[in-house]
């Protein structure tokens, strides 16, 4: 496996290909600013939950490093890991079904599965390969590498967007994604 590109996003730092990108915002506002300045052409972004926004933005920056950008393919996997799954959205959804008012929100419920973010990225880029989201007890580079290596055992898989995508709430998050080739 060969790493072709790397992106790191935290509430106050964005690193793409080893270069720090400067933005005025932080936290949730940072993701919106990056979207407006670097992506800006995917209206579904504003319907996404914080985890999906983080993964979407990180993948867009990561794929911006690829020349030419690869789309409409069956040989690219999307494999993410975190420790809290979609717990932030689960808590938001729980608020809509509390005893004080039973008004479940379908808009929030849609994002109560962490693998929604892998689907959003696959749909955006027309990737038809494996999409997986693994929940680990903690960030474990060795385990993540082993799982990605297993994905490459599929003879169809030639590349992957893979890495850590943790979002405990809209202000606290970490993305460390890699573009990897076989």
Language-model-derived ranges and their functions:
Residues 1-182:
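Conserved "HGTGT" condensation-loop signature of ketosynthase/thiolase-family condensing enzymes
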